[in-house]
A protein has these predicted regions:
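Extended, folded cores of ATP/NTP-driven motor/assembly subunits in large transport
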Residues: 2-415
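Short glycine-/polar-rich loops that comprise or flank the Walker A/P-loop
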Residues: 106, 167-168, 497-498, 519, ...
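P-loop NTPase motor core of the ASCE superfamily
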Residues: 152-162, 546-604, 608, 768, ...
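Glycine-rich phosphate-binding loop of nucleotide-binding enzymes
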Residues: 441-526
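A short beta-strand-to-loop transition that corresponds to the Sensor-1 phosphate-sensing loop
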Residues: 506, 760-765, 791-793
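Sensor-1/coupling segment of RecA-like P-loop NTPase cores
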Residues: 751-768
Length: 854
């Protein structure tokens, strides 16, 4: 019965109204208990008053930040560099310069390092300009638009996700006398400026450094600053700041970002080279090193105390093994004291704080554990500040907050040791080349540095003192990423409007990529589809003697040079045959001169006349040369007393020319040129010629195509970038083809003068650097300002051990590099280990192209 019910309880009836109320109360109590239980499972956050939590303010009159004791704050930014790739002498120069920072005139300071998103806004705008100037009714322009749009979208996305990152290094100094403070900052600039780009930050840049610390999740900053002091501090204040207890440790919570601060508790007295760089670039971790002059004699006092402790332990030690270890430690410490006294090293105190960030306490703890595990082998042990999380949090902040740092945080060492622990190791590349007054060519994002995760925005047309041409050398064993890297360059450069030529010996992915880019695939093993007439005269336009331009075409007489080209062409074609000697060559050249004479071209005919009056179909072909020699033979045989030796020479020449004029190779070489070079991407497919015995025909056709491309490059009337990819150029690296190798060297030396670059690539480094052609191979590589070394294995790296091409310190990396990793030399002053990062869309396309050929 609803509302009224009875139940037995000690034979007494229960009031149903009271019973109902009791049930409600029990329900409320149960609910409260569950809530309390749930609360216990949640992270408890104690909030701080934001204004009390941040120990500095803003001086509107001076337009500077200052701490609560009235000390003004100034910052000096310095650029990172990869000194690991330097020679020993260069490394020591950087180390010595850095160690000179630690002196009494500069005094106490802080070095702060943090990760920021890569600066890509300018590149995004440049991509937009290129997109806006395309004609989308043109099929090739539509393809270019898609490539540019893909690159632009990727940059926009990674700017938000911080997939592309940079590293910022700053010194922080403070003092009440602004003039003296500026002088101290100028001393840092003067000391480091000769070695790495160093400058004093203005207020806006100083503001951004501090803002990034207190707003670690911010994805963008303001375009305008507030005028009022309170407003500026309001910009800096996070929405909330609190503390989370995690056992005996505490985390600072900053707008849902959890932060834990650690400091170096133990480090080796003889630290690893550039030790601080490993800490200063350890992922998305904020690094802060405080330093200050130590008391006179502090270091020797500390070591004397250590010696006293060792002596005491030696007296207590019972076994010989322990005594022996302590004796070695005693001798080592004593030597350090004597050295410091002799050299007069200045003692300095330093301490290092690290801020670890994460979206949860668990994530922060996992990062901390990884950090502990990573650095224990380097002799570093970290500790957490107990019951002082906010104080240590602010010690990491770029404000030189010293919190009256106690001795337990500071370590005493020498200025030389601090210099040895050099922290500014970071590598990134931001290439930028002027396109028009307000626009630059967007570079190609090729990946990130392996050691520091810096971005690599690469443009081979960047001109600097140490980057004098546009040539690239690419090498790597099969399957290590060389071909995909070439495809990535070709793909992006198509979008940027390069004119690109590809000499393709493999005939696999590159011809499919050319088709994808609406380029022209020319089958150079089938004359009906792609023939280049070797007798079509090539031009070579030299520089004028005055150095003020090129020699005019009406002052160039090209037949003589072209005959020399044909001499090298025929030498390559004959291969190992020794039947053709100098007399036979002379006879063939007389026939060549004759057939050119029939169309009114001789050694006095100018290039301008030929250009104005001759088309492809007007030139002679090899069958004309063959027929001429055959006619001469008939005339000799009709003579009353024919010269038998002369007859034999003619017959040998005919036998030599017959395959190329009427035989198996006539389809390749005997006929007029029928290729169209109007496409922006042209792939000359030579793969079907690889089966030729000794690659004789392959090398000959390679040379023929190369010379034809070279003529097109130097004759190009458009002011545009051009790049020639000579894949597997090792086919011409043979002592038999010395003329071709020398021609290749000429092209790679002179191509820059025509706004063009050459990219020789190979997986057969043994063919390029073998003893018989090593001189030519090294010359080709050294003439490439940009060099990319993918994995070579033990056998491949052996060829570099007797050269200066790869530093000894990098040879092991190149030997064991993973797929897609390379050692990159960018000019003479920049080198880095790079992990190639191809965009997802392009990578999927390339993978399909690779799979389709199987």
């Amino acid at each position: 019965m609803f509302g009224i019910f009875k139940r037995k309880n000690k034979n007494k009836d229960i009031d149903p109204v009271k019973e109902k109320q009791k049930l409600v109360n029990d329900s409320i109590k149960k609910s409260k208990k569950e809530k309390k239980k749930k609360k216990k499972k949640q992270t408890k956050i104690d909030r701080f008053d934001i204004r009390d939590a941040i120990p500095f303010t803003y001086d509107e009159e001076k337009n500077m930040f200052k701490d609560l004791d009235g000390n003004y704050i100034m910052m000096v930014r310095t650029a990172g560099t990869n000194i690991f790739g330097f020679k020993d002498n260069d490394q020591y120069a950087f180390i010595r310069a850095f160690s000179r920072i630690f002196n009494n005139s500069i005094g106490a300071g802080q070095i702060y390092s943090y990760m920021v998103g890569a600066d890509v806004d300018g590149y995004v705008a440049d991509f937009q300009y290129f997109k806006d100037n395309l004609n989308l009714s043109n099929p090739q322009d539509r393809i270019r638009y898609e490539i540019l749009d893909e690159a632009q979208r990727r940059l926009k996305y990674t700017a938000l996700t911080k997939e592309l990152v940079d590293r910022c290094f700053v010194f922080i100094l403070k003092g009440q006398d602004i003039f003296q403070l500026e002088q101290r900052c100028q001393e840092i600039v003067a000391t480091l400026g000769s070695y790495q780009k160093t400058s004093i930050l203005d207020f806006m840049d100083t503001f951004l450094v501090i803002y990034n610390f207190y707003h670690p999740q911010a994805s963008k900053l303001f375009t305008e600053m507030a005028k009022e002091a309170d407003d500026i501090m309001d910009y800096l204040y996070p929405t909330r700041i609190g503390m989370v207890d995690v056992g005996f440790r505490q985390c600072v919570e900053l707008d849902r970002v959890f932060c834990r601060t650690k400091f170096i508790h133990i480090y080796r007295k003889e630290p690893a080279f550039a030790l601080m760089s490993y800490l200063a670039t350890a992922g998305d971790i904020d690094f802060s090193m405080h330093f200050k002059p130590a008391e006179s004699g502090a270091l020797t006092k500390s070591l004397d105390k250590e010696i006293h402790n060792i002596e005491r332990n030696m007296q207590k030690a019972k076994d010989a093994s322990t005594q022996s270890k302590l004796m070695k430690q005693f001798d080592k410490t004593q030597t350090m004291v004597e050295k410091m006294v002799a050299e007069g090293d200045t003692p300095f105190d330093f301490t290092v704080f690290l801020r670890i960030k994460g979206d949860s306490v668990q994530q922060v703890n996992e990062i901390c554990k990884d950090l502990d595990d990573s650095f224990v082998s380097m002799g570093i042990q970290f500790s957490d500040g107990v019951f002082e999380p906010l104080e240590l949090f602010n010690c990491t902040a770029p404000i030189l907050y010293d919190y009256e740092l106690k001795d337990r945080f500071y370590k005493t060492t020498t200025t030389a040791t601090l210099g040895w622990m050099y922290p500014f190791v970071f590598e990134a590349l931001y290439d930028s080349t002027q396109y028009s007054q307000d626009v630059h060519y967007p570079p190609v994002y090729i990946g990130n540095t392996i050691q520091t995760n810096g971005v690599v925005f690469y443009d081979n047309f960047t001109k600097k003192d140490d980057r004098s041409n546009y040539n690239e050398f690419v090498v790597g064993n099969s399957g290590m990423g060389k071909t995909f890297f070439l495809m990535w360059l070709i793909y992006n450069r198509c979008g940027l409007g390069y004119k690109q030529y590809i000499l393709d010996v493999e005939g696999k992915e590159l011809n499919k990529l050319t088709y994808e880019l609406d380029g022209a695939n020319i089958d150079c093993s089938n004359g009906e589809k792609g023939r280049i007439n070797p007798l079509q005269i090539r031009f070579n336009v030299p520089d004028s003697d005055t150095g003020d331009g090129k020699v005019p075409l009406d002052q160039i007489y090209p037949l003589e040079q072209h005959i020399r080209f044909l001499r090298s062409f025929l030498n390559a074609y004959k291969g190992d045959s020794d039947e053709i000697g100098i007399l036979h060559t002379n006879l063939i050249e007389r026939a060549l001169t004759h057939v050119y004479g029939l169309i009114n071209i001789d050694f006095k005919t100018t290039a301008q006349y030929i250009l104005d009056n001759f088309k492809s179909e007007d030139y002679p072909i090899f069958s004309d040369v063959y027929d001429t020699i055959q006619q001469w033979l008939k005339e000799i045989e009709k003579q009353p007393h024919p010269d038998r030796a002369e007859i034999e020479r003619h017959k040998v020449c005919l036998a030599f020319l017959e395959p190329i004029a009427y035989g198996a190779d006539a389809n390749l070489f005997n006929g007029h040129t029928n290729v169209d070079l109007s496409a922006n991407v042209i792939n000359f497919n030579l793969s079907a010629l690889q089966d030729n015995t000794g690659s004789r025909v392959l090398a000959t056709q390679y040379y023929n195509v190369l010379s034809y491309i070279w003529t097109d490059i130097i004759s190009d009337p458009f002011n545009r970038r051009k790049q020639l990819y000579a894949d597997e150029f090792s086919v011409i690296m043979d002592p038999r083809y010395l003329d071709i190798m020398m021609y290749f060297q000429t092209v790679i030396k002179r191509v820059r003068k025509y706004m063009a670059g050459l990219t020789p690539a190979t997986q057969q480094i043994s063919d390029v650097l073998k003893d018989s052609v090593k001189e030519q191979g090294e010359a080709i590589i050294e003439n490439s300002v940009y060099q990319f070394y993918f994995g070579l294995g033990a056998e491949g790296i052996e060829y570099f051990k007797k050269t200066h091409l790869i530093p000894e310190s990098e040879q092991e990396f190149v030997q064991f590099a993973n797929i897609g990793e390379c050692y990159a030399k960018i000019g003479t002053s920049t080198a880095m280990r790079v992990r190639i990062q191809i965009g997802d869309e392009a990578f999927n396309k390339f993978t399909r192209m690779k799979d389709d050929r199987k």
